[in-house]
Amino acid sequence: MTTQAPPSNLLPLNPEQLARLQAATTDFSPTQLAWVSGYFWGMLNQQPGAVVNAPATAVEIPAITLISASQTGNARRVAEALRDDLLAAKLNVNLVNAGDYKFKQIASEKLVVVVASTQGEGEPAEEAVALHKFLFSKKAPKLDGTAFAVFGLGDTSYEFFCQSGKDFDSKLAELGAERLLDRVDADVEYQAAAAEWRARIVDVLKARVPKDTPAQAANSASGAVNEVSTSPYTKEEPLVASLSVNQKITGRDSEKDVRHIEIDLGDSGLRYQPGDALGVWYQNDPALVKELVELLWLKGTEQVNVEGKTLPLSEALQWHFELTVNTANIVENYATLTRSETLLPLVGDKAKLQHYAATTPIVDMVRFSPAQLDAEALIGLLRPLTPRLYSIASSQAEVESEVHITVGAVRFDIEGRARAGGASSFLADRVEEEGEVRVFIEHNDNFRLPANPETPVIMIGPGTGIAPFRAFMQQRAAEEAPGKNWLFFGNPHFTEDFLYQVEWQRYVKEGVLSRIDLAWSRDQKQKIYVQDKLREQGAELWAWINNGAHLYVCGDANRMAKDVEQALLEVIAEFGGMDIETADEFLSELRVERRYQRDVY
């Protein structure tokens, strides 16, 4: 970081002091500079006449370490709100993303608060994987001198609801830490639960920290360390943009319907980086709303209350409630409410409830187990509609005021009736070109190109997991980055499912893409996947890794990401001369060094 100094006659420092200050801070990150700024501010604001010789009193106040383990941004938002609450209470708090936390220092922590989301089949957020592994390893220290609290975020439509939060909570207690507050497990509608928990944990922490000490003011600014987005557009206040291109990029005979979507951001000034995600607010299909209303013998004109507003039922269902994802809780509550002879036997059997919810959309649950509900009872069953996140498939270095995404339209039949995913069918079928789309950027600092343009990059992205790597290549091409780039891509058929084929061929021809390995799972009798290609190219892959390459994986979390990681472990073990356990430690080190990054869902 370089700073243009003002004229020397305006500085309160002499040249020697200025040189020492610049030398001491030249390699500081923005986070560290913010902390130092707050620390000196605190020193300045001690009582008049006080003499500051050394920050000796600062260590008397236990710092609250607030760890954000976020996958889609919700955990980060809760953690940032708690940080602000703690600062307002004049408590010393240090907010850190789990991926940046030096987890071996946990034994020296006095107060730890974890806000943890869950992904996939009960796995921790990507940025928290290394910390999770460390705590569950033999290297984890005893934490007898530590007190902690955990807030978990999850989605009850998944079997392992809030499992990551449960893991952190149980393991910290097992290691000897004192639980300050019972863990809270919050569903997608987490805001009220989070607000209540924040108030409770602030009160608990205030009772643990000595009062009225100068060190509190000196350290309180250390919590204000996260970069704050200056964009006026957020999840709560999205940009109303325009859909300019909706192009099917799979072949006529493909079993998949994948769309290349381009959205015009106009003069909004909305900025993003390769690796970020686009949040899309969608509306439910009016035909689906009509079908559900009629199945329940309702009219759709009934008035219901939504967040303090009175709306017609049909409008509320189209704009405000999730209709395409069923959950075990919804099934259980519907069964109890309607006394359904079909569904009541499932109540109490978690596995059966989960399976039924995963295979039976809400509208078909009502069709198979009909009942008559009033409008408010229906609304009470449903969860609020939430935006969907899509990996961004473009770089503003090339597309400027546009953002591109790659959308796999979810389509299936239930007993001959066509069903579709909420957001994907909205984008693929119901938004006309030049139609309005409400969007926002979800920044993802855990999926970034190397800072050094000479660093080699290995990208593994089957299916729509290819999206962020299109952004990566646009960025590397625009910067004329000399680093080598290697892409692994897979899909069922070469002729029908080679997404962005012409672009990849052009990048190869121009030398931007150094090599590409393709896996077509259905073009031959034996299925071939990207993980098979990784093993096939193991020696070269290991050579790239040894040469400092960064590894990136994007796509399905439940199967692909696990299979790819297993293949990577086998390659590292075989060609690195390690056993699997040592290879796992090696891969964990790559993760800590930000050389192994995943965007999985």
Curated annotation (Swiss-Prot):
Protein's UniProt keywords contain Manganese: no
Pathway: Sulfur metabolism; hydrogen sulfide biosynthesis; hydrogen sulfide from sulfite (NADPH route): step 1/1
Domain Flavodoxin-like intervals: 64-202
Gene Ontology process terms (BP): cysteine biosynthetic process; hydrogen sulfide biosynthetic process; sulfate assimilation
Binding site for NADP(+): 521-522, 527-531, 563
A UniProt-annotated Pfam family: Flavodoxin_1
Gene Ontology MF: a single term: flavin adenine dinucleotide binding
Stretches assigned to the FAD-binding FR-type domain: 236-450
Subunit structure: Alpha(8)-beta(8). The alpha component is a flavoprotein, the beta component is a hemoprotein.
Task of the protein: Component of the sulfite reductase complex that catalyzes the 6-electron reduction of sulfite to sulfide. This is one of several activities required for the biosynthesis of L-cysteine from sulfate. The flavoprotein component catalyzes the electron flow from NADPH -> FAD -> FMN to the hemoprotein component.
Name of the protein: Sulfite reductase [NADPH] flavoprotein alpha-component
